[in-house]
């Protein structure tokens, strides 16, 4: 797997919502364009800042696709891929289209408080399943 260099200013994007709680794609496009045009060196999509856990699987996939298409290769993208269930995360890693992304970002399962060995096993499984470099 090729290493990537993450230098400079990375911005974790928020996910804007409409009044009906659907994703506001017009506002999301504005956020992306603002960050790219103002010098962000890379963007982090669907991390904890973006409220990714409140989105359905199809919404997460659509946001990831939309941002990748909007950025169109102008700067690197990192896709947030986290879950409290390692097994479910493995399935999501297999099903996700990573087109346009340079790496994934994964956080420690936060609800069930795994042991140090559990954290190690979780991230070992993530690293083995991910087709991209993993940022912890």
Q: What feature does the model see in each segment?
A:
Residues 2-136:
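Active-site beta->alpha loop and helix N-cap motifs at the rims of alpha/beta catalytic domains
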């Amino acid at each position: 797997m090729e290493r990537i260099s993450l230098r400079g200013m990375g911005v974790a994007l928020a996910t804007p919502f409409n009044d009906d709680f659907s994703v506001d794609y017009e506002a999301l496009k504005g956020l992306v364009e603002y960050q790219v045009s103002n010098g962000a060196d890379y963007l982090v999509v669907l991390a904890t800042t973006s409220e990714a856990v409140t989105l359905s699987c199809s919404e997460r996939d659509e946001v990831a696709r939309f941002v990748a298409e909007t950025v169109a290769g102008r700067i690197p993208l990192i896709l947030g891929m986290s879950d409290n269930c390692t097994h479910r995360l493995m399935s999501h890693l297999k099903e996700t289209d990573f087109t346009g992304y340079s790496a994934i970002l994964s956080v420690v399962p936060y609800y069930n408080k795994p042991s140090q060995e559990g954290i190690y096993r979780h991230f070992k499984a993530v690293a083995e399943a991910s087709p991209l470099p993993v940022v912890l």
